[in-house]
């Protein structure tokens, strides 16, 4: 096989399983090598294909799925040029065609000789594999199904040009690599290694419609985000207000709503602000829109991290890229804590107004501030009724609201979070008290 001749997709030849399969395709009949060693490598390859398939949730022709997965994850000059934008013209496209011709040889390989050589029909397992279509430890089901569709299409393709078009269309629709195939990310510091932006696999699939009420703040957030994903001017957003009012849920709903339009989100904690420049360097040239998300953001008077954040948002020599915004949630309107004792200290400050402005200037760098207030009693009861109906909870309304009032008095007061916790409590009661339809 010609994997050593790959140019644009050269990183594929570093994949051990592909190398082993390529070696078997060339040498499985070569008597120079011990038969037992060849047979052991054959079974090891089949084992690894099955392991990867079950981990990813693949089904159908697993060999084709494996190759398709390599292609959609390979970040190279061609795939990056095509992500979100589509086919690129010129010499790069011609060089990519050369590689797809080699990939077609892997797709079309006839394994019947190996089966005859080793006397086993085990390859039948991977040609039409029926896996658990509900589970994938790597991708969400939609992306997993798309990769399986790509595998099916490239396996049936008549030419390298057709394979190239199928894969390129995937890049245009979904992107490539970790940023293309995942919604949300976090910063990781593996021991002894550099900072990494890692995909978050298990995300909360909350929708904006799931958040009962708060229509005005939700619409403000939607309007700003839609402008951003459409390439129009948009602002950094600060969502502030009472605890449990849906600030974080709204952010989660935003990424789920606009992921299909190229929106991605990176969660950053306060102690990771020093990594922001490196994060932005990794994402500024990608064809996606990135929200850097900071949850429950606030600073004590002795913390200085807010100064780094100010420089990142606006004020440093390097301009923040057009494909990056910062969204933050906080229970504090002004983010930096102030005490009455600060007034006493400012009596000795010759430029006390400058000190005040220093602490307020971070908030000013968020162009849009959206207030989420706690619901009143009537709004709280409406949230409870909507959530009860949504979860098929059947109780007399008077009893439902009476129990809800008792719950909020004992569990943190009036908020959307308290209402949801009350509903979760009801769902956990003994059957017979509550009827929940399947």
PLM feature segments, named:
Residues 369, 373-438:
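C-terminal alpha-helical "lid" subdomain
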Residues 347-360, 367-381:
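Conserved AAA+ ATPase "SRH/arginine-finger" region at the nucleotide-binding site
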Residues 1-154:
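Intrinsically disordered, low-complexity N-terminal extensions of AAA+/P-loop NTPases
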Residues 150-154, 196-219:
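Dynamic helix-loop-helix/coil hinge segments at AAA+ ATPase domain boundaries and subdomain interfaces
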Residues 133-197:
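Interdomain "pre-motor" coupling segment immediately N-terminal to P-loop NTPase/helicase cores
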Residues 300-348, 354:
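Conserved catalytic/switch belt of AAA+ P-loop NTPases
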Residues 263-266, 277-321:
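Conserved nucleotide-sensing/catalytic segment adjacent to the nucleotide-binding pocket
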Residues 236-267, 278-284:
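Walker A/P-loop
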């Amino acid at each position: 096989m010609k994997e050593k001749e790959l140019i644009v997709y050269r990183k594929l030849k570093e994949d051990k399983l592909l190398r082993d399969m390529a070696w078997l395709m060339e040498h499985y009949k070569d008597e120079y090598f011990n038969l037992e060693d060849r047979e052991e490598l054959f079974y090891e390859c089949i084992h690894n294909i099955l392991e990867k398939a079950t981990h990813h949730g693949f089904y159908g022709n697993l060999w084709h799925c494996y190759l398709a997965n390599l292609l959609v994850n390979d970040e190279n000059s061609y795939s990056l040029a095509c992500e979100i934008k589509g086919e690129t013209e010129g010499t790069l496209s011609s060089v990519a065609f050369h590689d797809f011709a080699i990939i077609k040889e892997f797709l079309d390989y006839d394994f019947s000789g190996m089966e005859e050589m080793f006397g086993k029909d085990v390859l039948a397992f991977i040609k039409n594999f029926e896996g658990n279509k509900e589970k994938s430890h790597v991708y969400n089901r939609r992306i997993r199904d798309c990769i399986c569709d790509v595998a099916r299409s490239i396996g049936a393709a008549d030419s390298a040009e057709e394979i190239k078009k199928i894969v390129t269309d995937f890049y245009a629709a979904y992107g490539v690599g970790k940023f293309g195939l995942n919604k949300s990310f976090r910063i990781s510091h593996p021991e002894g290694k550099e900072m990494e932006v890692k995909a978050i696999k298990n995300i909360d699939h909350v929708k904006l419609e799931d958040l009962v009420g708060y229509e005005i703040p939700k619409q403000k957030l939607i309007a700003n985000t839609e402008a951003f994903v459409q390439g129009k001017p948009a602002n950094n957003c600060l969502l502030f207000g009472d605890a449990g009012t849906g600030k974080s849920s709204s952010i989660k709903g935003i990424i789920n709503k606009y992921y299909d339009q190229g929106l991605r989100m990176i969660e950053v904690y306060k102690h990771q602000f020093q990594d922001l420049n490196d994060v932005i360097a990794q994402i500024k040239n990608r064809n996606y829109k990135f929200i850097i998300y900071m949850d429950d953001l606030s600073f004590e008077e002795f913390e200085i991290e807010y100064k780094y954040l100010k420089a990142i948002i606006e004020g440093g020599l390097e301009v923040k890229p057009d494909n990056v915004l910062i969204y933050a949630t906080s229970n504090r309107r002004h983010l930096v804590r102030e005490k009455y004792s600060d007034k006493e200290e400012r009596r000795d400050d010759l430029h006390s107004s400058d000190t005040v402005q220093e602490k307020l200037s971070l908030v000013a760098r968020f162009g849009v501030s959206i207030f989420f207030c706690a619901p009143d009693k009537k709004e709280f009861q409406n949230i409870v009724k909507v959530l009860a109906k949504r979860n098929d909870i059947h109780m007399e309304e008077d009893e439902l609201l009476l129990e809800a009032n008792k719950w909020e008095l004992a569990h943190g007061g009036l908020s959307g979070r308290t209402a949801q916790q009350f509903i979760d409590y009801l769902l956990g009661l003994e059957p017979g008290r509550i009827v929940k339809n399947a």
